[in-house]
Amino acid sequence: MRQNCILSILTVLILTTLSDGYENYLYRDYSVRNTYNLYDLVNNPAFLRLNNHEDLMTYEIRTGNQENGYQRAFDPERIETAGVDIFSYKALDEKSALATRIVYETSSLNNLYRSLEKDFYSDYFSYTDTTTGDVSYAGPRLSVIYNREIFSRLLTGLQIDYGIERGLKDVYTKCESISRNINVIWGLGYSSYSGTSLGASVRYFDRQGSYEAVKEITDAIVNTYMGYHIYYPEQPRSTNEKKVYAEGIEIDGQLSKKGFLVPSLKIEIAGGYGAKENSINAGGSSNPVQRGYWIREGGFANSILTYGGKQSKIGLELMAGLKRYHDWASPGDYDVINIENSITDIHYGIKTIIPIQSISLTIGYEAGSEDVNYHEYTVDYVFDEQLSRSLIFTDVDISLNQVMQMHYSVWFSNFEPWFYWNTSSIQTQGIEMGVERLFVFGKIGVSFQMEFWKPNDEMGSIDHFGIAFSFKK
Amino acid sequence: MVKYTLTFFIGLLVLFSGCFKDIPEFEDGYLNLNITIRYVEPRFGIDIVLDSAVVTLENADYKADVATDTTDSNGTVSFQELPWSKFIVTSDKEEMLDLGDGVVPVSLIADTVFLPEKEENVFTIFARGPAPEGLKINEIYTVGPPNNFFFFFDQYFELYNSSSDTAYLDGMIFCRMGSSLESVTYIYQFPGEPLIGREYPVAPDSFVVMAMDAYNYRDEIFSGLVSVDLSTADWEFVNAADPGDLNNNPDVPNIMNIEVGHTLDFMVGLSGDGLILGDGSDVNYFDGIDIESVVDCVEYSASPTHIKEMPEELDKGSGGVGQIKYSGSSLERRFAGFDTNNSTVDFVIITAPTIGYQH
């Protein structure tokens, strides 16, 4: 039971990291590799307590290094990351629980070519200058989840995530960026004795980003890209500023039924719909003007069918899902659409869990396709492609003895990337190894991960190495 | 309960979705311009369209290629599927016209700044003859060399005589203007008698360099790396009331400050100002400068949103949009003496100053 508890909370940690970082993504990606419980199916805080019954405290220190031997134009040559992560879960009484998380992360983007963004490609209106330099980012992130049973089997929960991050470039324009992000989710859930759970949640998120680029000499000219092919040269001035305001709302629903058709079959269905608006202002500190805005709107649906689950039997899981959204952007000066992007993403996967004595072997495969219709009207650029991807993986969990566990993962994948990767496909391969030992004072673990991305018919690769130490009690 | 909850959530989404902006009606890249170039001179009964005239569209918003095409026999040129943005439209052509002295070649210039409001745009630009030939403010070097200690004291200005006759600088004034023609910031005057003096001639097709200080900044301060050598300038500005104006070069004649109480050298805004060359018939700067006495006027500003300060009769636009302080760049007419009384069109930013010659 305790192991299940830890695993489920670690899943919470992973998902929270993905979805509630300094950029709030509107829709999450599902993978058959992960195990989803009632909470993290749509991040509904109403179900936190149903998945976790024992108090828990985890501490993690992690560091990573990524060498971009192959890179997009506005990517850094190397990324160094480090972070501290503290998580606690406590049952306050029989009906309520509280989970908190504090994360402090630093990252250093070395030899970053021109971009003043942490990820140039995540926005349609990205800021650049004309210098190459190192940019350091650092900041804390806080999360609080409160969960309570208000009536018999009727639950409610509130989750608040708040993060701040500051970035600084070491050469002119010495751009300083500050990003503030808030994410609030309120959820309701009902869980019957017969194993049927129904939930709904509403999410509001808001981000403010501020960039300040100063000028010393001539080279540091600031531009705002409109898409990826044309830019607006910002007026040369002593200080150029960019401000980003983004807010959005999403409603999600979920249904879970144990004993669906046959006793060992469970079905989980999740879906959501949301919209996000981004407004970008740029200019001098005294007269910033709207440089553009863009809106994303759409929804997703995901279904998981799980058979088995008891440790003594072979388990089987099937997943299928659809994500569909539409973006449109407009420059600030003129009431026209300058960028439009429609995405329809279909994914499906299968995994089987085979217990062999003290070993749990998981083998899985998933695939998907992203139907992209990206159009830049200002320069008439069209990227209309169906991008396929596939992944094969195996996870091995070994209980060496009563107090020690080992974990191995190996995966291979292939995906067709967007045009700005300038290659037809990328193959990835990765390996992860971890060991965890139980002591009288708690559990200490260490895990090591390597992942390599190799573009097709191109020189160079992206090599990622990471190591993490954890302490749980 | 479930029904009410779902209704509540959907209502909430609809409420918030309504707060977002509506999708615009038009896509970018479908702007069509149909431009006719016409020249009308009622005094001589001339009303013609300019055929085979090269029309240039320069995008003033985005970093984009310049579009060029030639007018047809109706004087019309069509540009299709352009991005929605501000364009500087220019055209020039030499026509054989009878302007009272027989048929002679006349250089006609047409220009306008176009702002899009609808998808299809049909309009006419009226060409005009060039501004009268004579002394022109040909180059303005104000931004300073590349440096990190805010050095800009190597400013200079260049005049050019575009006429076929000798011009005379005697008694002429050179002014830095305030926010209008009625507001004079600095006024400096050449020696000699205005209008009638003949001591300081400027030959046709020749340049005159006026330095803030006739000093070799390039070698003496910047070790020959950047900046300019102004020690051989034709004139230098001198203010007897400026105790800091120590670089008075004895080999270079002076243009003297005539503003009482003014204690600064002739230094102008690095990235924006208005300059006037006057014939010297009006030196009473208290009520501004008489527009009839203005020989040439140039307004420049690095800002694309700059609001005009000088009268449009003298200068319809402003040059130097995008020019960067401390870049070592300069602002010069497209061609020596090229003057349509629209500095937006007349001037281009050049990467380095050209002292006494055209780029």
Residue ranges with predicted function:
Chain A
Residues 57-61, 100-102, 158-160, 186, ...:
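Membrane-embedded beta-strand positions of outer-membrane beta-barrel proteins
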Residues 61-67, 104-108, 148, 162-166, ...:
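Transmembrane beta-strands of outer-membrane beta-barrel pores
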Residues 91-95, 149-153, 191-195, 258-262, ...:
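Outer-membrane beta-barrel channels and translocator barrels
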Residues 114-126, 203-245, 277-292:
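Short, flexible helix-coil linker/hinge segments at the edges of structured domains or between repeats
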Residues 230-353:
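Long, internal scaffold/assembly segments composed of regular secondary structure
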Residues 461-473:
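Outer-membrane beta-barrel "beta-signal"
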